[in-house]
Amino acid sequence: MFVEIRKRGRKKKYYLVHSFRAGDKVKRISRYLGSDLSERELERLKPRAEKIILEQVKEKSIFEFELSKREIEEYKKIEKPLKVEHLQRLDWLRFTENFTYNTNAIEGSTVALDEAKDLIEHKEKPHGADEIETLGVANAVEYIRKTRSKLNISLIKKLHFLCFEKTKSFAGKLRNVEVVIRDRYGNIVHQGAPYNKVPKLLEKLTKWYAKHKIKYPPLLLAALVHNEFENIHPFQDGNGRVGRLLLNYVLLKHSYPPINIRFKDRQRYYRVLQIFEKKNDIKPTLRFLISQYKKQYR
């Protein structure tokens, strides 16, 4: 964001301006700060204006993501090198084990890959929340594999419930509190949408998907749904895991194989999410997902 000064007669009017991408177009949102302001007044007024602008960007985000035919063809070229493979029963078991381990590890689970395999394949009895959630995520993977449900709020809540029904009192319920994500130093790196706007934003997301699911290539669709879901952050906790399940739900609906985002690549994963949040640029996410596909199906 930057401060823009516009002269009106003898007055100087100050605006905080933010540029962001909607598809391949650059859009701007500005917020009036005042006229003839001192440096001190500017610094005092900027934080609130920045917060308001970011909330406006969150509400727009992919809902203004419209591509021309030429741009759609460009995104198809990005996906073209992918070799689409269909998984057999044993492949699905291996994917479920690896996905469950990695997606939980990204969120801080201490369950090792071998332990996840024992729990899922050998039906060992779980002990503690991490092991219980391992089985919960595995059940959710099985659900997205078999369900015929359309993408809607009920499906999103169902995935959260399957993951956390035995460990979280709010499993399957949209949050009624504000949430932020902090880094290890305590700095806020992401702020979820205001909780009173969450149902409306999820409804917009599902309608956006329904409108574009035939028009846009599958990986682009899945990436946009995943990233926008993470921006909204509709649950009190567990958004990362549900978001990655939604990513795979969309891929499977379009006959693409599921994708496993690896724990060891989590820092790059976080970076592409932040680029999308701040610049509305989906290309880094697409390149990241393609790199994960190549590691998985090489």
Range-by-range predicted roles:
Residues M1-D237, R241-R298:
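FIC/Doc superfamily catalytic core
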